[in-house]
């Protein structure tokens, strides 16, 4: 039954990608935000998220936390809608939406052939960090968590390897060995600090 559900999810996402690609970047991103806010709470119960925010003392009151959760879902909706346009970020058609700060630091890393660890989190379109680093000339490998939906995971892996970062490291024990291999080859590593890793 899970395979059937995954297949239908895959069909829905592929259909949305097709529609978003027809709408153009800005319109698709804005509509994606609305879709995220509308359907996000159906995917994951807001009560647990609100409870976690309160436990972490984030937001002054319930209203503030509700706004934060709504914006979170909107952000995920935008990210979903922007996947069909990742290739355009790569080939500079959408570069006007990206501001790269610290280019001199990247130039130093390249010039001195340093191996460093780039750390970010799931802010806005988190895929763009690795894309911009590799595009700037950094020898890079990025750690990723495979999706549970194996139908959709193949699509996402293809997008990541083709347009974001050629060297993708699957999190876990085997990934730990790959990280060491890339570091020995003087590659830098990109990772998300808030990524769930229970092994390796």
Tell where the protein language model's regions lie, with residue ranges.
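Membrane-anchoring hydrophobic helices of lipid-metabolizing enzymes
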Residues: 1-120, 155
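Soluble catalytic domains of membrane acyltransferases
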Residues: 87-200
């Amino acid at each position: 039954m899970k395979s059937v559900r995954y297949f239908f999810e895959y069909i829905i996402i592929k259909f949305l990608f097709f529609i978003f690609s027809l709408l153009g970047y800005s319109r698709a991103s804005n509509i994606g935000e609305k879709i995220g806010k509308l359907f996000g709470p159906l995917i994951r119960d807001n009560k647990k998220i609100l409870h976690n925010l309160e436990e972490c003392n984030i937001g002054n009151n319930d209203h503030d936390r509700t706004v934060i959760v709504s914006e979170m879902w909107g952000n995920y909706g935008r990210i979903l809608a922007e996947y069909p346009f990742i290739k355009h970020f790569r080939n500079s058609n959408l570069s006007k939406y990206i501001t790269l700060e610290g280019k001199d630091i990247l130039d130093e890393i390249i010039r001195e052939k340093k191996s460093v660890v780039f750390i970010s989190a799931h802010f806005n379109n988190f895929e763009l960090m690795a894309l911009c680093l590799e595009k700037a000339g950094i020898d890079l490998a990025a750690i990723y968590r495979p999706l549970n939906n194996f139908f959709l995971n193949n699509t996402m892996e293809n997008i990541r390897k083709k347009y974001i970062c050629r060297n993708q490291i699957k999190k876990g024990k085997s990934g730990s060995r790959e990280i060491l291999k890339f570091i020995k080859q003087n590659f830098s590593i990109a990772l998300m600090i808030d990524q769930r890793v229970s092994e390796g």
